[in-house]
């Protein structure tokens, strides 16, 4: 497998994990696992980490990349929304989380430059991410279905035609990281 330069990170939305407070201890566990995994990817050549701005794993990834920049100043964070005005209908607390992620990003854009119109924009977003990254890191467990399943299926189909690395961090992995 060739070296990955650009990595897309996604996973569960906060509500899918039953996380509704910023101080939930599960966030610390997830961020610690992300930090270890992302540091390993950076040390093996990843230069760009991409997220889409979804609540949960993606916005926590932005915070982790912000922390990792002290040790790895060369790493870049790209925030690629599926459509224009993404997150505008969120409550104030969630919009603040998105604003924080934007402040940490080195690049911000949207794949579709129109406000949300149809699921086709989400499909184009997924296609764009797959074609512009060498792999994906997903905090996702097939035994606990969530919205990330759609991306995972598309990534698996894509990897049948193109060299594309998919790394899953499961619930067991998260549980075991607490024990380590």
UniProtKB/Swiss-Prot annotation:
Pfam families: YpsA
Record lineage: Bacteria, Bacillati, Bacillota, Bacilli, Lactobacillales
Family: Belongs to the UPF0398 family.
Signal sequence segment: none
Ranges annotated as spanning the membrane: none
UniProt name for this protein: UPF0398 protein EF_1150
SUPFAM superfamilies noted in UniProt: MCP/YpsA-like
NCBIfam families: PRK13660.1
HAMAP family with a match to the protein in the record: UPF0398
Species this chain originates from: Enterococcus faecalis (strain ATCC 700802 / V583)
